[in-house]
């Protein structure tokens, strides 16, 4: 017997692929007698994957090719060069799509093997929930399909260690040049005031750079630390430890791919000697190095005229200690938008929005305050970033606070214009008729984030926005006329919000998150605080009624069998346009301490977007904890890009994708 059993060979050349086939055959044996050889077979590895840089390595093995004829290579897109009997260089096409490479045996043309690859034109996930409308959809995902996202083919690939809890959504950039080489990069920031850049694909994890936002090169001064936030040494909050054990970077940063800037807000303190000195700074980091751009960070400071909580005379100033930079940052029209709420409702606090010139952070920001002559009205939205329409109008919701419909806007949805004369002019608002009741029971409308929906082509109301808060009511609003306030007291005597497009009371048990939109459907991740009961992930259709007006279905079109306890999920959707939709959510209920559900790993779930009752996969299914994630952080959102899913946890960034085959 003669063996020719060799390992598959493959190496990348430039932007192309080297594919190799190793012939295996069984010759004569048993004293010269001839044995009928087994049939030819071809194996191609890997059989699935994704290409962004147009370069990947494949290998083919041909069993029982006694004459060594090799294979014929073909593809549904792209080109081959340097073809030999068992090797070829493949260059993927520059256009996005899904492509199949086939190796066909020359000895038996009925035998072959194929590999399916996607070429994505996704440039990056630069902002919270994927886009300025906050739809949470990535429509340029070609590798992750419902048929591939199974326990057999999808799972945890690797983890990247970090120095603190990751409350931010990881951000992803394609084909970034670092140290002379192009690579995909995933960025994460921690509550220890660190920012990391990792190779998004390298296994084991490869750190490209780390920025310590408290060192002198990033504007820090001697003795600065992240702010202690739990236990007897807490310097913010009321002792609940909602952000535990420290506060550093909380709001999701935002990336400007044109300038190569990574905008992030840090929080820190010099605790001794007393009284403590608190800092919040806006940084613009270089994507390639982590170094400061624009001559370093700027200390955040602002004031407005007002006599509200914490004011001095007739001036209300920004307080770096009490204001919690909870929402994600936003970038629009050359301005970086930042919003704040409180630490555990610790007085005094207000809702602040500042807009900085993205090219010159030293210029005074434009300012808006939600309650300048009252109190509260924080902007937190369970980590959501403010939403924008294509005209540059900004939308966000506030929490409990003073309300009068004039200059105090607790439990309201606000529409602001871009910077003008140092301010952010208020254009419109909506406040539920039961605002006073919501405020009395801590029923923040602003526990959820706003989503700007695609504009329908029919109906009276064609510029729509959706919002949910703690009480689980879904509000569908006309962005051109949000509806303001329908007073329950005489003479209006309002018992509901009849002035808006649609209201669905008790549609969810409650929501601490933001819905996602895809292909005529909205996905809501409900929950109920306290941990004793929760809610399913629910889908509501968004379509035209008989009059042509686009509305939500009055009941879910599908829902998950799994029930999510507090804090509930914010869904993200991956799809190839209108096909292969997958809804991704994190079960962060074990985000403690403190939590009624204890401490434990976050669980990543994947659902068929056309039927949420069909769960495709979750990270708790595989044997031997193969896909186990790090411990949970509440309100976090998965990032889906280039065939991978990135999840921030308390100690690591976990990376999921198609398993080697």
Q: What positions do the PLM features span?
A:
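A short beta-strand micro-motif common to beta-rich folds, especially ectodomain repeats
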Residues: 97-106
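Mobile, glycine-rich extracellular loop/lid and propeptide segments
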Residues: 121-418, 424-456, 462-486, 512-530, ...
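Short, well-ordered beta-strand segments
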Residues: 66-77, 113-114
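Bacterial Sec-dependent N-terminal signal peptides
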Residues: 23-43, 114-116
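Low-complexity "stalk/linker" and mucin-like segments enriched in Ser/Thr/Pro/Ala/Gly
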Residues: 74-89
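Short, exposed coil/turn segments at beta-strand boundaries within extracellular/luminal domains
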Residues: 106-113
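Short, solvent-exposed loop/linker segments at the N-terminal edge
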Residues: 48-54
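Acidic, Ser/Thr
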Residues: 59-65
